[in-house]
């Protein structure tokens, strides 16, 4: 996988926001109604995230879905 793929950039941003809030992957997963290994896969850029799950993750982090894309390279 390319180091700057959309999935890896999204995963890095998700990890950054999770770390800023002091959440573990397990805590974020629970707040979002997802599985911990799913969240881990997203953070590693291994998962293609459905729109519904982007919204769930954003709500769990108290951000907008757009905030999950704010640090993307062009």
Where are these regions (language model features)?
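Conserved hydrophobic/aromatic packing and binding residues within compact polymer-binding modules
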Residues: 14, 28-29, 39-42, 68
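DNA major-groove recognition helix of helix-turn-helix/homeodomain DNA-binding modules
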Residues: 52-67
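Short coil turns linking two alpha-helices in DNA-binding domains
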Residues: 24, 35-38, 50, 64
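Short basic helix-loop element that most often maps to the first helix and adjoining turn
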Residues: 12-27, 31
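A detector for short, charged/polar N-terminal pre-domain segments
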Residues: 1-9
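Short, charged recognition helix plus adjacent turn
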Residues: 2, 59, 69-74
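Recognition helix of helix-turn-helix/homeodomain-like DNA-binding domains
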Residues: 33-47, 73
């Amino acid at each position: 996988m390319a180091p700057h793929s959309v999935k890896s950039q999204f995963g890095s941003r998700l990890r950054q926001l999770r770390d800023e809030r002091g959440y573990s992957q397990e805590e974020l997963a629970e707040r979002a109604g997802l599985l911990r290994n799913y969240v881990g896969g997203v953070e590693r850029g291994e998962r293609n995230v459905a729109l519904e799950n982007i919204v769930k993750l954003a709500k769990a982090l108290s951000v907008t879905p757009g905030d999950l894309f704010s640090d993307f390279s062009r």
